[in-house]
A protein has these predicted regions:
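Active-site-adjacent structural elements in enzyme catalytic cores
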Residues: 1-181
């Protein structure tokens, strides 16, 4: 990663822009979860229906506090790490984040660049795989640039983690595995 990339990406996010960044398994596309226009732009870019919902990543549990009612101890114990959990959202969480789902998908990321970006932006971020409509997720910055070109506002140039698959998604209340890893 080039010096200054993190701060530049964080400023773009705070202004409502879209940024690609490395995560545990693949590149993620992210933005400010509460910036409606940014989230809807991201969904259009991916060709993803709003009703599918989105994952939020954070550097720590404090960044998730404005979005969730509580984080169970067994969930906290799995973080930071490649574990995404469905938890109860606050009533104020907009539908463009949760989609048709009663719970919100959240993760405290273990990827150092993704975590540093959340810290630099001062917020949890939307995190969805860098692909279009069910395609194979981009695993390098070059793949991201080839897929999206100038449609993104910024790409952080670094490498993804060594996770062998996307993070599993599990319901924190029922324990049900919603998406295998």
């Amino acid at each position: 990663m080039h010096p200054g990339e993190l701060q530049q990406a964080a400023q773009i996010i705070r202004r409502g822009g879209l940024v690609a960044y490395p995560t545990e398994y693949c590149f993620g596309l992210g933005c400010d979860p509460l910036h409606r226009a940014a989230v809807l732009r991201l969904l259009r870019l991916k060709r993803r229906p709003v009703d599918k919902g989105l994952i939020l990543i954070a550097a720590d549990t404090e960044q998730l506090a404005r979005y969730v009612t509580e984080i169970p101890e067994h969930v906290r114990a799995s973080w930071p790490g490649p574990h995404t959990w469905l938890v109860e959202p606050r009533e104020s969480v907009p539908g463009w984040i949760t989609g048709q789902h009663p719970r919100l998908a959240v993760r405290v990321t273990a990827h150092p660049v993704a975590a540093a970006l959340c810290k630099a932006a001062g917020m949890a971020l939307v995190s969805t795989s860098a692909n279009r409509g069910g395609g194979v997720p981009a695993r390098t910055d070059r793949e991201v640039e080839r897929l999206f070109g100038r449609e993104l506002d910024f790409v952080i140039h670094d490498v993804v983690g060594d996770a062998p698959a996307p993070t599993p998604i599990r319901d924190a209340v029922t324990g049900e595995l919603v998406r295998p890893g």
